[in-house]
């Protein structure tokens, strides 16, 4: 365990040392710009991964948080002369508050409804940034001065090092947070919210906190984005950026800081692939070859179903055909990003880092630690009530959700030494009754509710 920890920490240090040293070996301004974007997208994707990877919610509002953070920093710099460190902190704090206010109503929704709510917020923010000309200069865009640090303007190389330093701080803070009690709560929320509630962890409270945290990191990344490009335009932070960010998290690997950085590199490089017809064609052919090999292998070994094997093959084949047919791939950006996202979600749900971790574990035959021996029944149930004793008694129990009466007028007596079953069709209130009895839901009405000890 200690050896593995040393290797992981050493790899993290090596990553940032190599990234920090690259500008000394790279003289191209274009390459330095890509490295700077990698650091900025890394901060944004670490924040998005909290919601998508750990909370299991499809968050389509991260592009809006980037936009709000960028404009907040830009306005603070142009009107009030705020330097870059304070602007990044203030933008992050502002978007944390905005994220919390959005999460309070939105997280009462689940699945597609939550995704639609966050996507609507992104569209609303883009419209507001475009229409509030007195504040944002509207469609004409907002010019931002060069970033200042302690009163001195930063050149491109110094700004890159600042971005890498911020990424390293975010990495360190998130690594410690995700290994703490809060991080374990985030991870449990994705797998089973009901079990998390049953263990006394406030599901809704932790979801709001996680969403706000991810939004704050998105705002901080937006501030860095503003100072990097020195120009902001409202339509930058719309659907296309939303899909690119989501693609970066999924393709890099969810629930992984390494995956966020890998995804950031892909996000930084992907738009540049579309600008070169030859590069995009080569990328499409390689993606199709990988999908074909993985799909056929999964079908032969029966480790995957036909849909998960064939759908990525069809999607990447469409990309290959498009790369030869389309005269200008830039015109098909949204369709290309959507096909890539579909291929990754279906064919590689664990992402590149998850796939690499699994492959390395198989290669080096890494075995998980042995589980402790099962406890004896006497340890789990040290005492038992005499047969016939009433342990649970309900009378007139009801639980309503608005006008829906999920449970209404239930009478029940559970005695020791007996086994009871709830029988009924879907939607008849079986799970709701168990949740009320276990304390997850408060009863709307009850005449008698008594839970007695077995002793």
Question: Over which residues does each language-model region extend?
Answer:
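Transmembrane alpha-helices and adjacent helix-loop boundaries
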Residues: 1-378
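Conserved beta1/A-loop at the N-terminus of ABC ATPase nucleotide-binding domains
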Residues: 392-402, 448
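Pre-Walker A (P-loop) beta-loop-beta motif of ABC nucleotide-binding domains
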Residues: 410-421
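The feature captures the beta-strand-to-loop junction immediately N-terminal to the Walker
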Residues: 423-425
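Walker A/P-loop
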Residues: 431
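Helix-to-loop junction immediately C-terminal to a conserved catalytic motif
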Residues: 438
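Conserved small/polar residues in nucleotide/adenosyl-binding loops
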Residues: 454-455
């Amino acid at each position: 365990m200690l050896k593995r920890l040393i290797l992981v920490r050493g790899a993290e240090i090596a990553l940032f040392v190599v990234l920090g040293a690259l500008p000394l070996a790279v003289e191209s301004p274009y390459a330095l710009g890509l490295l700077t974007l990698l650091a900025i997208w890394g901060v944004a994707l670490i924040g998005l991964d909290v919601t998508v990877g750990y909370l299991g919610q499809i968050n389509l509002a991260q592009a809006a948080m980037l936009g709000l953070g960028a404009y907040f920093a830009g306005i603070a710099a142009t009107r009030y002369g705020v330097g870059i460190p304070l602007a990044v902190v203030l933008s992050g704090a502002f978007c944390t508050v905005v994220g919390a206010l959005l999460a309070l109503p939105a997280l009462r929704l689940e699945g597609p409804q939550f995704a639609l709510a966050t996507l609507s917020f992104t569209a609303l923010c883009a419209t507001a940034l475009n229409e509030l000309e007195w504040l944002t200069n509207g469609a004409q865009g907002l010019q931002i001065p060069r970033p200042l640090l302690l009163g001195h303007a930063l050149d491109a190389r110094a700004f890159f090092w600042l971005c890498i330093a911020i990424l390293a701080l975010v990495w360190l803070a998130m690594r410690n947070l995700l290994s703490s009690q809060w991080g374990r709560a985030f991870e449990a929320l994705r797998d089973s919210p009901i079990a998390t509630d049953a263990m006394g962890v406030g599901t809704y409270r932790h979801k709001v906190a996680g969403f706000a945290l991810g939004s704050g990191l998105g705002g901080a990344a937006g501030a860095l984005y503003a100072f990097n490009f020195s120009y902001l335009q409202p339509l930058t932070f719309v659907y296309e950026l939303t899909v690119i960010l989501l693609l970066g998290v999924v393709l890099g690997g969810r629930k992984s800081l390494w995956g966020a950085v890998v995804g950031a590199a892909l996000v930084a490089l992907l738009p540049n692939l579309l600008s070169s017809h030859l590069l995009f064609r080569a990328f499409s052919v390689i993606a199709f070859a990988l999908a074909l090999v993985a799909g056929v292998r999964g079908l032969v070994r029966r480790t995957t179903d036909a849909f998960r094997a064939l759908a990525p093959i069809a999607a990447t084949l469409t990309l290959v055909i498009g790369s030869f047919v389309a005269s200008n791939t830039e015109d098909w950006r949204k369709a290309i990003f959507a096909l890539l996202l579909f291929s990754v979600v279906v064919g590689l749900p664990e992402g590149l880092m998850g796939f690499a971790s699994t492959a390395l574990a198989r290669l080096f035959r890494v075995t998980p630690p042995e589980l402790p021996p099962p406890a004896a029944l006497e340890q789990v149930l040290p005492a038992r009530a005499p047969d016939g004793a009433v342990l649970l008694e309900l009378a007139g129990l009801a639980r309503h959700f608005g006008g829906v009466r999920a449970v209404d007028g239930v009478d029940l007596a559970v005695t020791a030494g007996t086994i009871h079953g709830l029988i009924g069709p879907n939607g008849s209130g079986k799970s709701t009754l168990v949740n009320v009895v276990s304390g997850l839901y408060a009863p709307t009405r009850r005449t008698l509710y008594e839970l007695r000890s077995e002793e």
